[in-house]
Every structure is written in C-alpha cells, then in structure tokens.
Design a protein with these regions (language model features):
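Surface-exposed, interaction-prone regions used to assemble/regulate multi-protein complexes
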Residues: 1-127
C-alpha cells in the first residue's frame, strides 16, 4: 500500500509506539522503516509494518537531540547531532516514537532511544 500524506488533510495513521528499525537516505528521499503503522478503521485498531518516506528532503537540515535520561522531571542534559551522524553512530539502536508532530514543512518525532544494555533515553528527531 502506498500512502502520500498531503499535510493539509486529517492524519489517517498514527506512529505512536512505532519503532524505527532503520533509517536510509538516497536520492533526496529519507526513509524510516517502522515495525508498525497504526490505523483506526470503523473503531478497530489495525497495524502494518511500513516505511515513512520524506521526498525532496535536505538531510543537512535534519537534527536529532539525544538526552541523558527519559524526560519528565528534574535536570537533564544532552547533545544535538545531525541526522547523518545519528544514522552513522546509532545503527544498532531503536527509536520508539511517542509523540509525532507535523508543522508546515517540519516533522518532529519525540520518543525513546533504546540501545542494547542501556536504559532508554529521550530523543527528538527533526525532519
């Protein structure tokens, strides 16, 4: 199934709890491979594995903020890295989308970054 989101319509799918398994960038297309895309049809929740594609994406304008813990209370610190650096350094990690936001020409995913043997931390991806 191919779905093209036109950003002016209601959001038909949810990525909440989706886990990004792989990120690829080729020919100005950024592709996030996720384990599940959720859809509500007639009150029923359905899920499908799939890909989220951003065509004509300038990867130099994409960033990831990685924090030292899951955010919610207290002090925290973190770092900002380019999406390309994230793709290079976090190949064995998994990013679970908790909140998705669509703002004009920007998409924001906030969630948990999971690495083997470590506690999850909050990360924010700007596309």
């Amino acid at each position: 199934m191919k779905f093209i989101h036109d950003r002016s319509s209601n959001i038909l799918f949810s990525l909440h709890d989706s886990r990004v398994k792989e990120i690829k960038y080729h020919n100005e297309t950024l592709t996030l491979q996720v384990n599940k895309i959720y859809e509500f049809v007639e009150g029923e929740k359905r899920s499908y594995p799939g890909e989220i594609c951003f065509e004509k994406c300038d990867i130099d304008l994409c960033d990831v903020l990685i924090f030292n813990k899951t955010l919610g209370e207290g002090r925290f610190n973190g770092k900002s890295i380019s999406l390309q650096q994230f793709m290079d350094e976090y190949t064995d990690s998994e990013f679970e989308i908790i909140i998705e936001g669509y703002y004009g020409n920007t998409t924001t995913y906030t969630g948990w970054l999971r690495e083997e043997g470590k506690r999850p931390v909050t990360a924010i991806m700007y596309v």
